[in-house]
Design a protein with these regions (language model features):
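Conserved AAA+ ATPase "sensor/coupling" helix adjacent to the nucleotide-binding pocket
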Residues: 62-65, 134-135, 143, 161-180
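Walker A/P-loop nucleotide-binding motif
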Residues: 10-32, 49
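Conserved catalytic segments around the Walker B and adjacent sensor/switch elements
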Residues: 38-48
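Conserved AAA+ ATPase "SRH/arginine-finger" region at the nucleotide-binding site
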Residues: 46-50, 140-142, 153-166
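Conserved NTP-binding/hydrolysis module of P-loop NTPases
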Residues: 41, 51-70
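Mid-core helix/loop region of P-loop NTP-binding domains shared across ATPases and GTPases
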Residues: 52-53, 68-111, 120-123, 162-166, ...
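Short regulatory helix/loop adjacent to the ATP-binding pocket of P-loop NTPases
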Residues: 33-36, 136-151, 160
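C-terminal alpha-helical "lid" subdomain
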Residues: 176-273
Length: 273
C-alpha cells in the first residue's frame, strides 16, 4: 500500500501491481483510492479491458467528465492533454487505474504508454496504475512492450498469506465483526492450520472458507469451529480438487508482510458493510 501511495503522490507515472486471483488486488486499490479521496486527486477506474484503443480513450475521457461521444482519437487526445495540463497547473493529481490489465491488448497498452508522454520537465501529468494477474507480468516482459516496461517506476507483487498472516487475518476479521477477545477460540490453531492448508493463504478463499465454516458450526450448535468442519467446507467448495492440482504452500514463508494487506482488506469490507 505504501509503495502504491508513494508512486501516485510523487507522480512517478507508471505503477504496476500484480498478484494471483483472490489475493486482494482490487480491494487494495479501493483502499488506496479512499486514501487519495481528500488529496486533490481525481481518478478514472477502468474495469473493462476488452476495449480498442479508441474505446479506451473514450472511456477515460468520459470518466474524467469530458465530452467524448463521437470524437476521433486525435480529438480525444487533445481534450485529455488540455485537461491534464489544466489540472497540473492547479497542482492536482490525475490517475487512471486499470483493473484486470492482463486483458489489455498490446495496442491499448501502447496507447497508454503514449499517454504517459504527457509530462513536464520533472513530473508526469497522468499517473497510471496497472493491476493484474501473473499474465500481466508476462505481457510486460514481452519484446513488443519493452518501451512500456522501462517506464514502470514501481512494480509490486501481492503474494498469498503465509500461515501466521492467515491467523492474523482471521482474528482481525473476528474483531472487526465485533467478536470478544475470547472469540479467538472460535478458530483454534489447528483449525486455522486446516484453513491455510485448503486455501494456501489466498485471502478470498480464507474469507469464504471461514464464513461457511462458521455457518456450519452454528447450524450444529457448536461453540467453536473444529478442523473437520473446515475439511467438509473445503470439500463442498471443491478446494480439495484444487489443492490436488496445486500442492499446499504450508512450508512457504515470505519476507513481504501480507498482514497489512489483510488489515486493509478487512477494514475496507467493514467500512462497506
Amino acid at each position: 500500500m505504501a509503495a502504491l501511495y508513494y508512486g501516485v503522490q510523487r507522480r512517478k507515472g507508471f505503477v504496476a501491481l500484480t498478484g494471483d486471483v483472490g489475493t486482494g488486488k482490487t480491494l487494495l486499490i479501493r483502499c488506496l483510492l479512499r486514501m487519495l479521496k481528500n488529496s486533490n486527486t481525481v481518478w478514472a477506474h477502468v474495469f473493462n479491458c476488452r476495449l480498442s484503443s479508441l474505446e479506451f480513450l473514450d472511456y477515460a475521457a468520459t470518466e474524467f467528465g469530458l465530452a467524448a461521444s463521437g470524437k476521433t482519437k486525435g480529438q480525444l487526445l487533445q481534450d485529455l492533454s488540455k485537461y491534464l495540463f489544466s489540472r497540473h497547473q492547479r497542482k492536482l493529481t490525475t490517475v487512471i487505474v486499470v483493473d484486470d490489465a492482463q486483458g489489455l491488448s498490446i495496442e491499448v497498452l501502447e496507447e497508454i504508454r503514449l499517454l504517459s508522454n504527457l509530462e513536464t520537465e520533472t513530473e508526469k501529468l497522468l499517473q497510471i496504475l496497472l493491476v493484474g494477474q501473473h499474465e500481466l507480468d508476462e505481457k510486460l516482459d514481452s519484446f513488443e512492450l519493452r518501451q512500456l516496461k522501462q517506464r514502470i517506476a514501481l512494480r509490486s507483487h501481492l503474494e498469498p498469506f503465509n500461515l501466521e498472516e492467515t491467523r492474523s487475518c482471521i482474528r482481525h476479521r473476528l474483531r472487526c465483526a465485533g467478536a470478544p477477545s475470547e472469540a479467538h477460540d472460535l478458530f483454534a490453531d489447528e483449525t486455522i492450520e486446516t484453513v491455510f492448508r485448503h486455501t494456501r493463504g489466498v485471502a478470498r478463499l480464507v474469507n469464504t472458507v471461514c464464513e461457511n465454516a462458521l455457518i456450519a458450526a452454528f447450524a450444529r450448535q457448536l461453540t467453536r469451529v473444529p478442523p473437520d468442519i473446515v475439511d467438509e467446507v473445503a470439500y463442498d467448495l471443491r478446494l480439495l480438487r484444487l489443492n490436488a492440482a496445486n500442492p499446499s504452500r504450508a512450508e512457504y514463508d515470505k519476507s513481504n508482510s501480507g498482514t497489512a494487506t489483510c488489515i486493509s482488506i478487512a477494514d475496507s469490507r467493514t467500512a462497506d458493510s
